[in-house]
Amino acid sequence: FIFAKEIARQAEQPVLILTGRSALNADQQAELNELQQLGARAEYRQVDVTQTEAASELITSITSDYEDLNGVIHSAGLIKDNYLMSKTNEELTQVLAPKVKGLVNVDEATEHLALDFFILFSSISSVAGSAGQADYAMANAFMDSYAAYRNALVTAMYRHGQTLSINWPLWKEGGMRANKEIENMTLKNTGVTPMRTETSIQALYKGLAFGKDQVIV
């Protein structure tokens, strides 16, 4: 919701479609109400984009309802901390699916649309690694590589819109925020504090301005 709020503040009466696999809860409904108070036409659609048909139906329904789709922010992700040797195939699949299968499905479902941007929320773990998160790091590394792949398709005129993969650090607020235990451990081991909302918004703007496939925050 952090970036949806920024769009609502900066754009005039934007249409914002937020999606997720889970049913809308009370906190999310409150944030939707806030987006609407900011002037946005905001709604939530429950969908699992790791299912090819569901992703296709989502994009079809959006373009049917609103005639156009200007951009995509793919921020799906799931963490199941454990050492790789201890993880089951099911756990690996659950972690990889949102950032791998989900990304491919959404990209292919929008391949015919003249998007302005296609932004991928990756993680610093794909660059620096993270204990107990080998599968998560791999999923994010896929996103980084996919950004370059999609930009090549844009150059070849098979896709539209700038693709950018952003390697985010720990967050202070929002849906990707770290819990207090991880926050304290990271501070102790690295001296790094979680990123605040204002920093993330500026990082997104600057990342888009750089015109690169990938930026590390």
Region spans (language model):
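4′-phosphopantetheine-dependent carrier domains
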Residues: 1-217
